[in-house]
Amino acid sequence: MARLAGVDLPRNKRMEVALTYIYGIGPTSAKQLLEKTEISPDLRTDALTDDQVAKLRDAIEAEYTVEGDLRRQVQADIRRKIEIGSYQGLRHRRGLPVRGQRTKTNARTRKGPKKTIAGKKK
C-alpha cells in the first residue's frame, strides 16, 4: 500500500482515482501529476515501484498544498473573513450559506434541523 502525503492509498484502484483520496487533489490535479511524473493513469496502486512513489511524493510536495496544511489554510481564511467583518465572514458566523444561495426554503444542511415556531391559533 502506497503512502503519500500521510494518506494510505487504496491498493486496487487505478492511480488516477487513488490520488483523489488525498485532500486537495481532485481528478484534474491527479491527471496532471501523473503526466508530469510519467506514470500511467491505468496503473494500479499496488503495482507502483518505490521509485514511482518517490517521484509522486516529490511532485506533490513541490506543487500542491494538501491534507493538514490545506485544512489549516482554509480555516485560517474563514477566521480572517470573520475577523475583518466581511459579508462572507458574517454568514460563516451565523451558520448560513455563504455564496448567495436562497434561505427562505432549503439551506437545511447549513441551518440544521427546523426549529418549530408556535403557529397562529384558530
Swiss-Prot record:
Annotated GO biological process: translation
Keywords per UniProt: Ribonucleoprotein, Ribosomal protein, RNA-binding, rRNA-binding, tRNA-binding
A GO term for molecular function: rRNA binding
Keyword Cell cycle: no
Pfam families to which the protein is assigned, alphabetical: Ribosomal_S13
Statement: the UniProt record of this protein carries the keyword RNA-binding: yes
InterPro entries found in the cross-reference section: Rbsml_uS13_C (IPR027437), Ribosomal_uS13 (IPR001892), Ribosomal_uS13-like_H2TH (IPR010979), Ribosomal_uS13_bac-type (IPR019980), Ribosomal_uS13_CS (IPR018269)
Region annotation (Disordered) ranges: 93-122
GO cellular component, one term: cytosol
Database matches in PANTHER family: 30S RIBOSOMAL PROTEIN S13/40S RIBOSOMAL PROTEIN S18, SMALL RIBOSOMAL SUBUNIT PROTEIN US13M
Function: Located at the top of the head of the 30S subunit, it contacts several helices of the 16S rRNA. In the 70S ribosome it contacts the 23S rRNA (bridge B1a) and protein L5 of the 50S subunit (bridge B1b), connecting the 2 subunits; these bridges are implicated in subunit movement. Contacts the tRNAs in the A and P-sites.
Record-stated family: Belongs to the universal ribosomal protein uS13 family.
Subunit structure, as described in the record: Part of the 30S ribosomal subunit. Forms a loose heterodimer with protein S19. Forms two bridges to the 50S subunit in the 70S ribosome.
Protein name as catalogued: Small ribosomal subunit protein uS13
Species in which this protein is naturally found: Corynebacterium kroppenstedtii (strain DSM 44385 / JCM 11950 / CIP 105744 / CCUG 35717)
